[in-house]
Amino acid sequence: LSQAQDQAIRDVVVRQESHGYPVVTDGEFRRHSFQESFSECVAGFDVPKNINLYYEKRNLNETPLERAEQNFEEAGPAIITRRGAAQRLKVVRNLPLEEYRYAESVANVPAKVTILGPDRIAQRFKWESSLNVYKGLDDFVEHIVAIERQMIADLVKAGCKYIQIDAPGYTAYVDKVSLERMRSRGEDPERNLQRSIDADNALIEGFP
């Protein structure tokens, strides 16, 4: 699989360069999901032992031009589904750094990487079942920022000049269904939004 991923990355880098892109990406070929830029880097989430079973049975009942709803409460990978923490999260690898090093090695122009922003991570964290590990969302997000700042620092040290903070979750704050989900969990959407903005600012503070 890693050899196939390597070849796919080389191919997509060449294609981007052939179109004159001044900065290229690796196409995220080493991820099941873009959200793995964080979940694959840490240990401590309460997840099933065999996550592959989730992907094998996953069915979103997708219909063209219609909203596909997902059951975020089912047992599955962290962040793709809402999972709690069995222990405080700890870094076990830096996937974006691994991606950057390979992309940079096969590219003739600078490579960029993406890191999932704190907002999506917080939205998919089952804080209510993790109060024996984290005091609440504020405590959890503060820890996420600390972890991701170290990941970014490692990327900067390796020479990466282009780091995208991926923040798709901000659309939730104008989406009725998502807002209702937050309120049903006892959360204040406006407080969540401000926390996420503050977290993003803290994440990039001091970096060039």
Where are these regions (language model features)?
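Domain-level signal for soluble alpha/beta catalytic cores
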Residues: L1-P208
